[in-house]
Amino acid sequence: MFVGACMLTIHLPVSASLKDKRQVVRSMKDRLRASFNVSVAELDPSNIWNQATIGVVAISHSRDYLDGLMKNVERAALRIANNLGAEVTDSFVEFL
């Protein structure tokens, strides 16, 4: 069994408060969950209102499937962030 994990660092230039940050992060998490069968969580519940880190995890018997899934998640995250006025500044994928 394989585990695929993706960490996304997001810059939120349009966010002027923690409320704005939570709104963007929640929307991004919900859309990724709805589009892919993955677990999504905010990894740094800090009070920095213009930056967030989101973790995405999936489990499968096929590493090739997870590789494709994580690539699709990264592409979707870039698109979703762009639509929300945010920017993915870094992404890291790891397989365990």
Feature-to-residue mapping (PLM):
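C-terminal binding/interaction regions
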Residues: 21
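Amphipathic alpha-helical assembly/interaction segments
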Residues: 11, 27, 31-44, 66
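A generic structural motif
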Residues: 12-17, 60-64
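Absolute protein N-terminus
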Residues: 1-2, 96
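Active-site-flanking beta-strand signature of metal-NTP-handling nucleotidyl enzymes
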Residues: 4-10, 55-56
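C-terminal structural segments of small proteins and small subunits
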Residues: 59-96
